[in-house]
Amino acid sequence: MKAAGAKQRGSARGRRPLVGKLVIFGIGLIGGSLALALKKRHAVARVVGVGRSRANLLAARRLGIIDEIAGDPALAVQDADLVLLAVPLGQTAAVLAQIAPHLGPHTIVTDAGSTKRDVIAHARKYLGAAFARFVPAHPIAGTEKSGARAAFATLFDDHKLIVTPEPETDSRAVRKVSTMWKVAGLQVSTMRAADHDRVYALVSHLAHVLAFALVNQIAGYADTAALFGHTGGGFRDSTRIAGSSPEMWRDVCLANRDSLLAALDDYLEELELLRGMVEASDGRALEARFAAARAARTKMAGEKKLKRKDAEGAKTTKQA
């Protein structure tokens, strides 16, 4: 993974904005927050929103997230400088097929999907010559909330963006997209798409599946109301992300099927190991296993940085 330089913040008022016309498909947490971040830094001239929910688009316009609602998506992309796909992964192929014949000769297309190999395959299939101007990207930021009302301008501050360009991807398009996200607050790194999908199956997708599973387990007992009445901070912290969009995470699981299955198999092995220790009343082995996990977590990003992230997570949990 290669760092792509320091963050670039701001576009001074009065200068030509970085992006002239930005068309966003999907005005939710990610698409809406990007629009707000760019507007805050005067880095975009006009934002056009496209989406399935008229009510959500109207809310986005009322909140100042977008400047206009696209009447015809095909017409909207014709003179766009940049098109962002921030829709659930299951909609990506259909959107690419819809816009491909109408893209301008210099329009850059990018996405914000949590998986990359499937998105790249769809883009290669539908975009034709415009595939060279498609920049696969994944902002590593978010909350468990969704929709335009969930968007906020500082969502991306001090988080990562992963770009996974293909050999034929235009380097100028990569620079443009990378700069846009840097302005929004992200630090940009580059990975191979296959490496990205394996890594995020392990450190993100698996965690969401486990959170959904834990909530469903408790909800499945006859005394579920009483059980939920006794939950404390540990349960809430472990399951906060189970409040995320079911549609989005259904699509992520299916799109990253092979990598996620491998991650689940490894996790089941770890559970079997722990179960065996509990069954054998092997306290020494349990403590050693827990201590190893604690040490690994502390080392993960440095204790000070980890405490800051924990504090941010606790704050988000209180707001949820």
What is each of the regions a protein language model found here?
Residues 2-72, 77-78:
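NAD(P)+-binding Rossmann beta1-loop-alpha1 motif at the extreme N-terminus of oxidoreductases
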Residues 4-8, 12, 308-319:
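Short, low-complexity, charge-dense intrinsically disordered segments
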Residues 73-108:
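Rossmann-like NAD(P)-binding element
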Residues 86-88, 113, 165:
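Glycine-rich, N-terminal phosphate-binding loop of Rossmann-like dinucleotide-binding domains
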Residues 98-149:
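Rossmann-like NAD(P)(H) cofactor-binding subdomain of soluble oxidoreductases
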Residues 153-240:
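Internal alpha-helical scaffold of NAD(P)-dependent oxidoreductase catalytic cores
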Residues 224-293:
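Interdomain hinge/lid region at the active-site interface
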